[in-house]
């Protein structure tokens, strides 16, 4: 059994195969996942797991250099936005519209679906390097 925090084998596999600038998304339970993207469905019931639990656990395993958020996130879900900023630290944030974010999902290695029900609880993580 793995000793690290992340136990989900599908998510662990995708992260281990990611290279510099590859992208993975984490979304709420309503985010439409394109057919072209690998779906990693973690949602069990409403609210479980949360978006932030999933983001924090993913960041234990994945080095990131940038995140992409919908412009609407800050205005519609300000508490979530502040929590994201706190968790990612000095990582660059790029803002695009929610519609552009949904289109960008097609370029992600995978889209992780959580049980989150907070509006705009969606993020795209761009992989960095550890050296």
UniProtKB/Swiss-Prot annotation:
It is found in: Cytoplasm. Keywords: Carbohydrate metabolism, Cytoplasm, Isomerase. The keyword Transmembrane does not apply. The active site is at 20 (proton donor). It catalyses: beta-D-ribopyranose = beta-D-ribofuranose. GO terms for molecular function: D-ribose pyranase activity; intramolecular lyase activity; monosaccharide binding. Pfam families: RbsD_FucU. GO terms for biological process: D-ribose catabolic process. Pathway: Carbohydrate metabolism; D-ribose degradation; D-ribose 5-phosphate from beta-D-ribopyranose: step 1/2. Its EC number is 5.4.99.62. Substrate binds at residues 28, 98, 120-122. The keyword Acetylation does not apply. Its main location: cytoplasm. It is an enzyme of class 5 (isomerase). GO terms for cellular component: cytosol. Homodecamer. Catalyzes the interconversion of beta-pyran and beta-furan forms of D-ribose. Belongs to the RbsD / FucU family. RbsD subfamily. This is D-ribose pyranase. It comes from Clostridium botulinum (strain Eklund 17B / Type B).
């Amino acid at each position: 059994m793995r000793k690290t925090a992340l136990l989900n084998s599908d998510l662990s596999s995708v992260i281990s195969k990611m290279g510099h600038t590859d992208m993975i998304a984490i979304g709420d339970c309503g985010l439409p996942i394109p057919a072209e993207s690998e779906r990693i469905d973690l949602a069990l019931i409403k609210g479980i797991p949360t978006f932030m639990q999933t983001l924090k656990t993913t960041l234990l395993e994945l080095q990131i250099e940038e995140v992409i958020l919908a412009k609407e996130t800050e205005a519609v879900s300000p508490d979530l936005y502040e929590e994201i900023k706190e968790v990612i630290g000095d990582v660059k944030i790029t803002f695009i519209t929610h519609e552009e974010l949904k289109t960008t999902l097609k370029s992600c290695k995978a889209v992780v679906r959580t049980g989150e029900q907070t509006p705009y609880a969606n993020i795209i993580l761009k992989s960095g390097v550890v050296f």
